[in-house]
């Protein structure tokens, strides 16, 4: 929405919209995400928006079934969440590292919110202290990446109000 309001000559930075497919989502969810990314890309093209969508997946040796069945890892649980890093974080970090190598630096926009959980609020508060500008923090694990969290103070009601008020492209 904000990008649509910019004059076309000011839309000079490519915006990469990423989704990480763990390859263990239900077929209904996977299909919906695929259609959403395709529709988002189609709308971006029609409206001349500098948006490129990406569906990221883990490397074969990091997939759920290779690790669970092939390597004998225990089923993930709260205290042993081996899958989060391999299925979600690593594909995203690899993508980001490639973009940093290409452009020198990036800004990652995340929809994380303090209201998601008590642990999320604690983690976000920790990074708040290191901010370089309002809602903009350095990533502690990747150099040359800033993290922008515009929704950090949104409540669950704020999210639902927004989703009901604005049509998804």
Model feature map: region roles:
Residues 1-169:
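Nucleotide-activated chemistry modules centered on ATP-dependent adenylation/adenylyltransferase
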